[in-house]
């Protein structure tokens, strides 16, 4: 309960709202991609955890590094739940990375190009590219972990 008391109450409430928004956005994206209903809760949880990890690490790191770390958590949880629920990892991964995808960066890059502010367009575009590369590298990293690790962690020791 101390988490919600004192001067940190506003920060705590903001974090809870952001977590909730990320969960809802992730579930909406899962709905768009026709993920089976029984996985909506886990998809939302993965997206929310990814966003909170991003926000926490953004306090100390740059956006690309924060995105990389948060997406490692998203991919790890996606693989773990995929083994646990015996379904493809993409069920959780595609919707789980939704809060971390640099959509605003792409928008602002295009906006600055259209308004002929090429310096800002270059800066935004390069940052967006770094975030996109961070997402790809984090996916590659976690997919290098052996499948047996996820079987052990999920308590699912049978080969499928």
Question: What positions do the PLM features span?
Answer:
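Alpha-helical transmembrane segments and their membrane-interface boundaries
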Residues: 3-76, 80-83, 87-89, 108-160
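The feature identifies polytopic integral membrane transport proteins across all domains of life
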Residues: 88-98
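Proline-centric
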Residues: 99-105
């Amino acid at each position: 309960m101390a988490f919600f008391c004192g001067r940190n109450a506003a920060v705590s409430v903001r974090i809870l709202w952001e977590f909730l928004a990320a969960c809802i956005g992730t579930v909406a994206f899962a709905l768009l991609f026709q993920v089976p209903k029984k996985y909506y809760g886990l998809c939302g949880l993965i997206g929310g955890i990814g966003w909170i990890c991003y926000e926490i690490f953004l306090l100390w790191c740059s956006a690309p590094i924060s995105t990389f770390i948060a997406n490692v958590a998203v991919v790890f949880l996606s693989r773990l739940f995929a083994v646990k629920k015996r379904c493809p990892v993409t069920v959780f991964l595609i919707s789980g990375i939704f809060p971390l995808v640099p959509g605003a960066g792409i928008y602002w890059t295009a906006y600055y190009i259209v308004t002929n502010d090429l310096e800002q367009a270059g800066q935004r575009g390069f940052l967006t590219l770094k975030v996109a590369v961070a997402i790809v590298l984090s996916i590659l990293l976690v997919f290098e972990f052996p499948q047996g690790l996820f079987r052990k962690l999920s308590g699912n020791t049978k080969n499928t």
